[in-house]
Amino acid sequence: MALKIGIIGPTNIKKLSKLTKKPASFFLDKAQEIGEILATIPCELWINSDKGIAFQIARAYKKNKGKKLVILYPAKGRPWPKKHTEIYKKFADKLRKEENWFWTNYNVIDKPDICICVGLSSGTLSELAYIKWNYQFKRERPKKLIAIRELLRDKKLPPEIEVEIKKIITYLNTTTDLEKFLKEV
């Protein structure tokens, strides 16, 4: 069975660029690199149907012959609209229709074996909170959270989350460290 890898990260690359004082091209280049790395290992890539870094990673993954892209999307636009998600669904090898946005955001961290955090945003913080609660209530999903320091504002996760899940966090300094880590998993 292939390793399932979920990606969580910002949808607004322009805002991320402003907050981190790094050019948008830095994040786009890193997304390309991560997608290329993930395409070299036998894994399923899980993302939400939205723009941003996760989608850019997924595009690079597919461009480099990644085996299976699973895209989650909400069946109902509640409590937030979903029309903007439609254009991303066509890239999927497998579509997972979730009941609503909660289940879409939750299952991108709960169904994969490993979750990779590629930057912070308000949406990413909610997904990190779901990981924290899964860990607190011994759901053991995901089994490992990878956080890439060069993509995080302060090179770490928020301490309110980090302190609760430190046993499952692996920090990697750069995206190039990801390939070595995944080959050892």
What are these regions, as identified by a protein language model?
Residues K143-K144, R153-T170, L178-F181:
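Accessory alpha-helical/coil subdomains and C-terminal extensions
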Residues M1, E184-V185:
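Generic structural signal for short, solvent-exposed loop/turn connectors between secondary structure elements
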Residues L19-T20, S25-F26, P159-I161, T170, ...:
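General structural signal for secondary-structure boundaries
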Residues P42-L45, K167-I168:
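Short active-site oxyanion
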Residues I13-K15, K22, L28-A39, I47-L157:
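Acidic/glycine-enriched connector segments
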Residues K94-F102, K166-E184:
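Short acidic-hydrophobic, aromatic-tinged amphipathic segments that line or gate anion-handling sites
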Residues M1-K14:
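N-terminal nucleotide-binding beta1-loop-alpha1 segment
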Residues A2-I5, C43, K143:
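Nucleotide donor/acceptor-binding cores
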